[in-house]
Regions:
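Short glycine-enriched nucleophile-adjacent loop
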Residues: 134-148, 156, 163
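Alpha/beta-hydrolase fold nucleophile elbow
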Residues: 117-134, 138
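C-terminal subdomain of alpha/beta-hydrolase-fold enzymes, centered on the catalytic histidine
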Residues: 237-495
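A catalytic-pocket lid/entrance helix-loop region that shapes and gates access to the active site
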Residues: 149-282
Length: 496
């Protein structure tokens, strides 16, 4: 794969003609001559992590329904598909949205499959992309740039595709506020509000006392403390524990951690030594107790603090983030690649709302995350990161309104990333007026679903929960229409 698809762009100077090895994995179990190629975009992880999509998930479902070939393409700078031996700021300059989606088109034109006798290269075979989350956005961007009747890519499904970039993404916590157990949500909102009040007083003794209740007095930085106690909900950027995002209809991938957390926070049978903690900081809030503080703190001490496995609480091996040299480590890693993309183009820093019920402390704002960018990517000889992400480079594809032929959009109603997706509450209402529009702009919001829940399967669509089952049937119908259209255009082209 070419490292640089844009030799005329000053953005990538000095240019290189070098190539790199980009891994892909394919399954021809269902393939029959004339069938489509389904390209699963690997996104921000290694290719192996996506194998379930070929084995039981959405690609398996579509392959079986259409006699297709399934392929997973590992994204550049992830897994073993790294162009360089390290990831300095200069070496990362080729990690951009436009280079990544150019990989997808180039791969479709040049890929080989040793067990298949004939060539399946685009545009002589119908290539249909699928991606979830960031890869869902890349699917949409790929179709907009390289799709169409005369393009390279024939169609694509963007699942929970985060096509909109914002600097601060405060909406991440909205589904928890709305759909979480309200006695749990209300307790956390009130506790966090009190924590922020104590912080605002500047009373360092009270702040240290407050942190000590959670077993986190060693964390001098308020942001580090705030992020650590937010982990059961989903801490900004890092998720060392499962949270709302890991809820799943498929038992093999589901986690009960969020429900266990809320059950602990609202425990009516907590012993007195725990419930008395609710009053330990009341002197700082006009005598008002901090309802369920003891339960919340007890959960953090029992389930979060032990994750450090003996490391110092304020170290980067635990919950400290204030070590500049830690961030400047240039070894290749998925987390470094993802951070670079976040810092340069996509932003979307999880942050607390400045007003109203917070769920997470208002210590968690854009500057807290932005400082990691500054430390991680010092200016190189050829490349430097912007002071804040250049969101326009990501949003130029259309944001909520990415327009492309044969682009299907599917989202989950309770997804924490929903407000960056097509069905965002900040986007226009999504109502399909007629059958023609349904074919031209296929879209579906899955009731009660989370983050790209349609990507999971159990090898029996009929046995799935009804809203997932019907989502998969909708995707099959959508793809079949695209393939009928492909055959029709091919036949008309031959007859001309």
């Amino acid at each position: 794969m070419p490292i640089d698809h844009f030799p005329s762009s000053t953005r990538y100077e000095p240019h290189t003609n070098a190539t790199f090895s980009q891994r892909y994995f394919y399954d021809d179990s269902y393939y029959k001559p004339g069938g489509p190629v389904f390209l699963y975009i690997g996104g921000e992880t290694s290719g192996e992590y996506r194998f379930s999509n070929l084995q039981t998930g959405i690609i398996q479902i579509l392959m079986e329904a259409t006699n297709g070939l399934g392929v997973i393409l590992e994204n550049r700078y992830y897994g073993e598909s790294c162009p360089f031996a390290s990831s300095t700021t200069d070496e990362l300059r080729f990690l951009t949205t436009e280079q990544t989606i150019a990989d997808n088109a180039y791969f479709a034109q040049h890929a080989t499959f040793p067990t298949i006798d004939s060539s399946l290269n685009a545009p002589n075979a119908p290539w249909i992309l699928y991606g979830g989350s960031l890869a869902g956005a890349q699917t949409a961007f790929s179709l907009k740039t390289y799709g169409g009747d005369d393009g390279i890519l024939w169609g694509g499904i963007a699942s929970s595709g985060t096509t909109k970039a914002e600097l601060a993404y405060v909406e991440w916590y909205d589904p928890i506020q709305k759909y979480g157990p309200q006695d749990c949500v209300g307790s956390i909102n009130a506790i966090i509000d009190k924590i922020d009040f104590v912080r605002s007083t500047g009373n360092t003794t009270a702040v240290r006392e407050m942190k000590a209740i959670f077993g986190l007095e060693a964390l001098e930085n308020d942001g580090d403390f705030a992020m650590t106690i937010a982990f059961p909900l989903g801490g900004p950027m890092f998720y060392p524990t499962n949270n709302w995002q890991e809820l799943n209809w498929n038992p093999e991938y589901n986690s009960e951690d969020f429900w266990d957390f809320c059950s602990n926070v609202t425990n009516l049978d907590a012993p007195e030594n725990i419930t008395q903690i609710d009053y330990s900081l009341a002197q700082h809030t006009n005598g008002e107790p901090w309802t369920n503080l003891g339960n919340y703190a007890n959960y953090i001490k029992k389930h979060i603090v032990p994750l450090c496995d003996g490391a110092a609480i304020d170290s980067t091996a635990c919950f400290g983030t204030q070590n500049e040299s830690y961030w400047a480590e240039t070894s290749n890693s998925g987390s470094r690649s993802y951070l670079y993309s976040t810092c340069t183009e996509s932003g979307t820093y999880q942050a607390a709302r400045p007003y109203g019920p917070p769920l997470i402390s208002r210590a968690l704002q854009v500057p807290y995350t932005q400082q990691w960018c500054t430390w991680a990517f010092p200016a190189g000889e050829y490349n430097s990161i912007p002071a804040t992400p250049e969101l326009w480079r990501y949003n130029k594809y259309g944001g909520y309104e990415v327009v492309a032929e044969r682009l299907a959009r599917i989202d989950g109603e309770q997804d924490v990333w929903l407000d960056l997706c097509y069905h965002s509450s900040n986007a226009p209402g999504r109502v399909t007026a007629n059958a023609e529009e349904a074919e031209q702009h296929p879209q579906l919001l899955i009731t009660g679903a989370g983050h790209h829940w349609d990507s999971y399967g159990i090898l029996d669509v009929a046995a799935e929960p009804q809203f997932i089952r019907e989502a998969h049937r909708w995707e099959i119908r959508t793809v079949r229409r695209w393939l009928d259209e492909w055959k029709g255009k091919r036949q008309s082209g031959k007859s001309e």
